[in-house]
Amino acid sequence: TIYLPMIPEAAYAMLACARIGAVHAALPLGLGPEALRRRLEDLRPRLLVAADAYFYRGQPVRVREVVEAAIQGLDLKVLWHVRGSPEFLERLYEARPAEPEPVPAAHPLFLLPTSGSTGKPKGVVHGHGGYMVGVAWALRHVFDLKPGEVFHTTADLFWIVGHSFGLYAPLLLGGTSLLVEDRPDHPSPGAFYERLAHLGVDVLLTSPAVLRTLRRHGEARPTGLRLAASVGEVLSPEIWRWTREHLAWPVDNWWQTELGAPALATPPALPAKPGHVGLPLPGVEARVVDEEGRPLPPGSKGHLVLGATGPAHMVDLQGGRSPWRGGLYWTGDLAEMDEEGYFRILGRTEEVIKVGEARIGPAEVEAVLLTHPQVAEAAAVGVPGETGEEIAVFVVPQAREFPEELKPLLAEKLKAHILRHLGPVPPPRVFFRERLPRTRSGKILRRLLKAELLGLDPGDTSGLEEDYGAGKAP
């Protein structure tokens, strides 16, 4: 098990495991002793490679005491990486190179928990052969990385995006991968742009959350970027257009931890439709179906399912119900497909808002809110109402210090804005937040917002970002 920040030693540990046929499992930093212990008890590792500290927004955060408390009584060895000490590198230099261990194509390479945005994380196991083929193909043909170019993803290595495109795919193609410790916008968004320009990054893979943060801070600076891909959440048309105008040509794509690499995408060679993630990639069969698995006509909202999932698909799933039913892989997402075969992702099916007879995906509401000039970020959930569910929205204002006395007026404007775009639905409830709760992979934790509003148990929040604050509601 690897418990390290975004430093080269984390990549060394992962690659070393791959070379000798061992299975690696990377865990996110910031877990408390109990959460870390639960994961270690589930994983039962023989070796834990752990850092004594990491940096968050420029400040050192000690974790050695957390690790020592978590491993009490567990049968495992710990290899410490001590910040500022040469001991770790000295041990590497003294070691003899290990011969690569031949393994079958489906031999487990790593185990990775899902992001846990809608519940308790599951353990996804990926193998060597198909996974490597899938991620290398995607980096070349979806993200269009060319020989000699530099690739950078803002995703941490503990997330599937970091595994696939922060480490393995760039190395498989002989490219250069840029790893950066700390938040992308630290110490400022300007530093992010300068880093891209100074290090000659050609292709960026980030999340809509990062793009929204950059937009909120003002106009971007020239970077030399050729492409800016987005993954992890729905990329709204408004943020797609901002990215094209201020950063680089956007490449939207959709996939999951279980799939290992993009399944739907709009590679730069294809016409883009802002708000639509794209078309099924080679080796992927996608459709929109009803509850019984029957195909729905274009323009209908339904379950996104896959008949074929591509070569990078997981080889095993631990601790969760199989997503396969009736010969189809049920993704858990609500989607639409248009007449040309382009898919639009509307949100997780368990987060769909049922307003009367209509089903509204949270992404639909959030995309509308993001077109308002005074909205920086937004999240939508369904809450009990008089005649079913009502829409509740949580908004981060564009202005960093939005006057408290003006919030009721803005709330009324946003209600009218939503009704103007979504049609006859009950007036939504509007709440303001300084920031939204996110997983460490950048996904909005809507279930936490809903739980806060209804006074319910939010469930597992161990994957929550460290700097989340509830803010204020009007």
Residue ranges and their predicted role:
Residues T1-L31, A35, H152-L157, R359:
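Conserved AMP-binding/adenylate-forming
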Residues I2, L27, L31-D52, A197, ...:
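AMP-binding/adenylate-forming catalytic core of the ANL superfamily
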Residues R44-L48, E65-L79, V150-H152, L178, ...:
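Conserved helix-loop-beta element of the AMP-binding
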Residues L47-A105:
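ANL superfamily adenylate-forming
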Residues M132-V150, I160-D202, H217:
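Conserved AMP-binding/adenylation subdomain of ANL enzymes
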Residues D202-L205, R215-A272, E285:
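Gly/Ser/Thr-rich phosphate-binding loop
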Residues L279-G283, R294-R325, Y342, I360, ...:
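Conserved ATP/PPi-binding loop(s) of AMP-dependent carboxylate-activating enzymes
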